[in-house]
Every structure is written in C-alpha cells, then in structure tokens.
Curated annotation (Swiss-Prot):
Pfam families: Sod_Fe_C (PF02777), Sod_Fe_N (PF00081). Its EC number is 1.15.1.1. This is Superoxide dismutase [Mn], mitochondrial. It catalyses: 2 superoxide + 2 H(+) = H2O2 + O2. The gene is SOD2. GO terms for molecular function: manganese ion binding; superoxide dismutase activity. The modification N6-acetyllysine is found at K68, K75, K114, K122, K130, K202.
Amino acid sequence: MLCRAVCSASRRLAPALGILGVRQKHSLPDLPYDYGALQPHINAEIMQLHHSKHHAAYLNNLNIAEEKYQEALAKGDVTAQVALQPALKFNGGGHINHSIFWTNLSPNGGGEPKGELLEAIKRDFGSFDKFKEKLTAVSVGVQGSGWGWLGFNKERGCLQIAACSNQDPLQGTTGLIPLLGIDVWEHAYYLQLKNVRPDYLKAIWKVIKNS
C-alpha cells in the first residue's frame, strides 16, 4: 500500500508539475466530492471558497506568471526571468499543494489507514496515534501560513513529517514525496472555527482519506 501511495502521489503531482515542462494553461481540478460532502467537519462555504476562489487564484496567477516568463525567455531578458521566480514559486506551489490536498480528503475518511502504509507509520513513528499527534503538533506550530506534511524519503526509505511555509511545495523544498498535506492557512478554517487552529486539526482528521 505504501508503494501504491507513493506512486499515487507521483501521479497526482504530474499535472500540477506541468510548470516544469512544455508551456500549457493549467486548469482547476474537479473535486472528487461535493462542496458539502465534508460537513459538519468542514462546511460547504469554506470548501467552495477554498477551491473556486483561493485555489483558482493561485492557478490564474500561475498562468499569468508563466506567460510572462515565456515572453522573458523569448527576449532573453534575464532580469525579468529572475524577478518572476517568487510569483512562479508561490502560485505554482499553491496549485501543487491544493491539488494534493483535495485528494487527501474524503467524506468516508477518518481513522487509521490499512496495510503497508500503516505498518510504515508504526515503524517510523511508533504507532498511528503517535504519528497523528506529531503531525498535528507540527501543523499547529506553523508560524503564520503554511502546510504540515507527511512525506516519503526515497533515499532513506522512510516516512518523515515536515512543515513548509506559505505555499512552498514539499518536494521542491525538502525532496520528500508528498503523501498527506494539511493546509493551515486561515482560509482553510477561519469562517467556521475563527483562529482556533487546533480545533481545525481535530476536525480535519475526521475527513482525511484512510485508503
């Protein structure tokens, strides 16, 4: 199951990582469930705004930045290419991170995973509860905006927990293959839970995909 999880993560990344290949317009991925499907844990208004407004904004700004970057490349304008890097990183990361995030959630989520992934979690963290506690602490502890992640370290062959600031993508920042991402930007929970991030973590574990 761990192999399937890693391979699945790579497939999820492929469309979003088009920023590294041939220039093409990126499109907003459809959610595999309705906006209201995660209620009462995450309400429909948050899901709609998060997906159709916030993710869409990263996507649109990424397309604009890439178009400008291609123009700068064609002109040989190195100064403009360098100046566009922050926008490409921020908006590209926002698109990649959210594309993964949506697939990590499920109306039928919550509880322990099964098979090889659970065994790997027990091996690397002691138990599922210890893993959950550690990822929760790392996610709650992110200063400002960012993400908490479970990733796979290909070199060491083990699972690792990491945090990334803002929209920095996990693989581009740490080299870890992202398996599970928790968005701790306030737009992910403020309308429902105000600024109480720990309550958001309690809620989101109830809809995190377990298969």
